[in-house]
């Protein structure tokens, strides 16, 4: 794990420019919001997620998150069928602020176009550099 200006970026994940991380585990993709995103939103008070069995499409909204600052769409980094929705996050939205990379995951999906879509995401090193460039811009 690396910290860039206080923002945690774990190794072994893929990252989208829409503030999502992806962890591939046995043909499934666990997805969640990055540390940078949750800190920008500040105190998260509500999360709306789709039901298991539905589908998500890469680069399209699948839910929303509400904070004391704003309401934001959740943009999926991958396409696929939703296997699991994290019930802890919908019942306790602050979990996204407290532990975005472990207990604060959002969905587990079976990807439908994994190789092509994964190639469009950033790896750990690219994500670190991207975060540095964002922070430098202010």
Residue ranges, per PLM feature:
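Acidic, low-complexity mobile loops and tails
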Residues: 1-58, 98-99, 103-113, 120-138
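Short, well-structured beta-strand-loop connectors
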Residues: 51-65, 76, 81-84
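Mid-chain, well-packed structural core segment of small domains
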Residues: 68-103
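Short beta-strands and strand-coil junctions in structured, solvent-facing domains, enriched
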Residues: 71, 115-118
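Short, conserved beta-turn/loop elements at beta-strand boundaries and strand-helix junctions
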Residues: 24-27, 85-91, 116
């Amino acid at each position: 794990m690396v910290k860039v200006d206080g923002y945690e970026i774990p190794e072994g994940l893929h990252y989208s420019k829409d503030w999502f991380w992806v962890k591939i585990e046995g043909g499934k993709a666990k997805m969640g919001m990055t540390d940078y995103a949750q800190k920008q939103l500040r105190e998260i008070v509500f999360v709306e997620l789709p039901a298991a069995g539905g589908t998500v499409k890469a680069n399209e909204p699948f839910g929303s998150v509400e904070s004391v600052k704003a309401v934001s769409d959740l943009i999926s980094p991958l396409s696929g069928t939703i296997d699991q929705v994290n019930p802890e996050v919908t019942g306790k939205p602050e979990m996204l602020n407290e532990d975005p990379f472990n207990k604060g995951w959002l969905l587990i999906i079976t990807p439908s176009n994994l190789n092509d879509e994964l190639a469009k995401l950033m790896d750990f090193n690219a994500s670190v550099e991207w975060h540095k460039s964002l922070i430098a811009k202010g």
